[in-house]
């Protein structure tokens, strides 16, 4: 290399080096320098992993020059207005899929973190099943701990395996099949529907009360009886239990609050309001009442108890009050909210699709009768599974409105995802240890490349079409892989039973013509309708 060339380079570089030596300690130079250096090292590390794993650069990357500060603020804005899920679907189905063909994976920044967002069924399969050990729950345990503690919904690794082994027997077929336990609660629900006298009312609010009543009875051995109120001339038999009246509202508030904490990722602790902490204390106080009641019983007493109570069965395995409370609340989140949301969306769609409603009603009446001729004793776990159109309606409600529309995992090691890189998006992409990977099932379920141009339309008939029966990982309403929902059959059975009983008793279902559609969606830990399911039923 000529000496003159080196001399010329030094002449050019030396002033810059001297400038940085003099000014590097100044914050307005130091901070940008650190950020640029970290960004350069991050890019270098990514390139190394791509070389190591024979991966390709991301096809899609959403630029955010605010280092990911604007993105969560924008998401919070849409969430506050009940349109964050609608926004997510529009972004995927109207931007990335259209501009980049069949690419369903994108890189973005949230609070300075480089995050991968995907709706690709192959990537979802890898995250949840084939590469299960490469991913963990990340910060989920941290931001949910104050409410749910250490339970199956929040734990990873050995703790999760122990929880699952302890809980799996509680969802055996004989427990799931006990639909008759629902009937007393359904009878109270009927009173509320009749009270409306054909006028518009919010059935979602009733469904959430119904499922908290049935879930607390199944789990705790005593219902909060939130449906039994003065408006129908009833009073709860459990009114003296501490925290009973406030429990449902406190549980709802704490979950909604946690959904905002989720958007802040590792900065979740910024949101820690007094009402949030008060709500958690109310929830724990109610749960502790029943835990102490169970622990006051001897092993012999527990064996003598009539009927099935989830808490009593767990108390045979452990006498630790915190373990019992944590597991109960973890199951309550999944069991209560998913069923209430499913029923709400199903009846919201049935009320605006009269042809579907009449067809479903006909199937139910033919199999189980109606009104005074209703053969309630014939509605069993087995007979519900034979109702093909009912199953199609439930499947379609879960497709258009999955209970958990958006979720995430964190890489436990340097790894890959099978698709999202290269010019066509079909090559593997590198994932760094500690990197967040989000998957939006709602957008997958509404992908026109998978479900056709009517992917956003509630159409149960699609479940009788051959191509829909081969969806694989393009339909995952209850997650999949080792962490597949233990209580999915419980939720499906309860939702089906309640649907059958309502359509046996009430033969007209409508909604106001000016009802907003698509509806505004609220995503706390599970999906629900922002404005309720306002219908007329008589």
From Swiss-Prot:
GO MF, one example: iron ion binding
Consequence the record notes for mutating residue 442 to S: In strain: EH15
Main location: membrane
GO cellular component terms, semicolon-separated: membrane
Signal sequence annotation: none
Subcellular location: Membrane
Mutation effect (residue 449 to S): In strain: EH15
InterPro entries xrefs: Cyt_P450, Cyt_P450_CS, Cyt_P450_E_CYP52_ascomycetes, Cyt_P450_E_CYP52_fungi, Cyt_P450_E_grp-II, Cyt_P450_sf
Transmembrane residue ranges: 27-46
Cofactor: heme
Cross-referenced Pfam families: p450
Keywords for this protein: Heme, Iron, Membrane, Metal-binding, Monooxygenase, Oxidoreductase, Transmembrane, Transmembrane helix
EC numbers: 1.14.14.-
Induction: By alkanes.
Family indicated by similarity: Belongs to the cytochrome P450 family.
Its biological purpose: Together with an NADPH cytochrome P450 the enzyme system catalyzes the terminal hydroxylation as the first step in the assimilation of alkanes and fatty acids.
Protein name according to UniProt: Cytochrome P450 52A4
Source organism: Candida maltosa
Gene: CYP52A4
């Amino acid at each position: 290399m000529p000496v003159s060339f080196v001399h010329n380079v030094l002449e050019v570089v030396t002033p810059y080096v001297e400038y940085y030596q003099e000014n590097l300690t100044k914050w307005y130079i130091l901070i940008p320098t650190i950020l640029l250096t970290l960004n350069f090292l991050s890019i270098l590390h990514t390139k190394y992993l791509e070389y190591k794993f024979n991966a390709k650069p991301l096809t899609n990357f959403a630029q955010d020059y605010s280092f990911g500060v604007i993105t969560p603020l924008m998401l919070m804005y849409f969430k506050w207005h009940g349109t964050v899920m609608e926004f997510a679907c529009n972004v995927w189905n109207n931007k990335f899929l259209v501009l980049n063909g069949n690419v369903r994976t994108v890189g973005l920044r949230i609070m300075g973190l480089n995050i991968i967002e995907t709706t690709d069924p192959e990537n979802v399969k890898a995250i949840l099943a084939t590469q299960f050990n490469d991913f963990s729950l990340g910060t989920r345990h941290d931001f949910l701990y104050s409410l749910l503690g250490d339970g199956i919904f929040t734990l990873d690794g050995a703790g999760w395996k122990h929880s699952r082994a302890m809980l799996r027997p509680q969802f055996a077929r004989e427990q799931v099949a006990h639909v008759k336990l629902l009937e007393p609660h359904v009878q109270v629900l009927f009173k509320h529907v009749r009270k409306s006298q054909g006028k518009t009312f919010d059935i979602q609010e009733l469904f959430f009360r119904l499922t908290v009543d049935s879930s607390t009875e199944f789990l705790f051995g005593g219902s909060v009886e939130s449906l039994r109120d003065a408006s129908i001339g009833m009073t709860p038999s459990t009114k003296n239990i501490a925290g009973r009246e406030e429990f449902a509202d406190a549980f709802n508030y704490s979950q909604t609050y946690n959904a905002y904490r989720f958007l802040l990722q590792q900065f979740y602790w910024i949101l820690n309001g007094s009402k949030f902490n008060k709500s958690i204390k109310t929830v724990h106080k109610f749960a502790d009442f029943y835990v102490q009641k169970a622990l006051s019983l001897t092993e012999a007493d527990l064996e003598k108890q009539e009927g099935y109570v989830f808490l009593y069965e767990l108390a045979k395995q452990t006498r630790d009050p915190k373990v019992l409370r944590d597991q109960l609340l973890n199951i309550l989140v999944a069991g209560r909210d998913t069923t209430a949301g499913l029923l709400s969306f199903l009846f919201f769609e049935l009320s605006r699709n009269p042809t579907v409603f009449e067809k479903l009603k006909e199937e139910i009446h033919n199999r189980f009768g109606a009104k005074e001729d209703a053969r309630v004793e014939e509605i069993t776990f087995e007979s519900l599974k034979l109702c093909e159109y009912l199953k199609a309606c439930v499947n379609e409600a879960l497709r258009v409105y999955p209970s958990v529309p958006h979720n995430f995992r964190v890489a436990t090691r340097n790894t890959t995802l099978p698709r999202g890189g290269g010019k066509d998006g079909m090559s593997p992409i590198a994932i760094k240890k500690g990197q967040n990977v989000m998957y939006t099932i709602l957008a997958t379920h509404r992908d026109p490349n998978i479900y056709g141009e009517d992917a956003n339309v509630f159409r149960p008939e699609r479940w009788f079409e051959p191509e829909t029966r081969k969806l694989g990982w393009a339909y995952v309403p209850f997650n999949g892989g080792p962490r597949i929902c233990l209580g999915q059959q419980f939720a499906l059975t309860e939702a089906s039973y309640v649907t059958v009983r309502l359509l046996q008793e009430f033969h007209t279902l409508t909604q106001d013509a000016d009802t907003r559609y698509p509806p505004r969606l609220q995503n706390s830990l599970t999906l629900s309708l922002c404005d309720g399911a306002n219908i007329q039923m008589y």
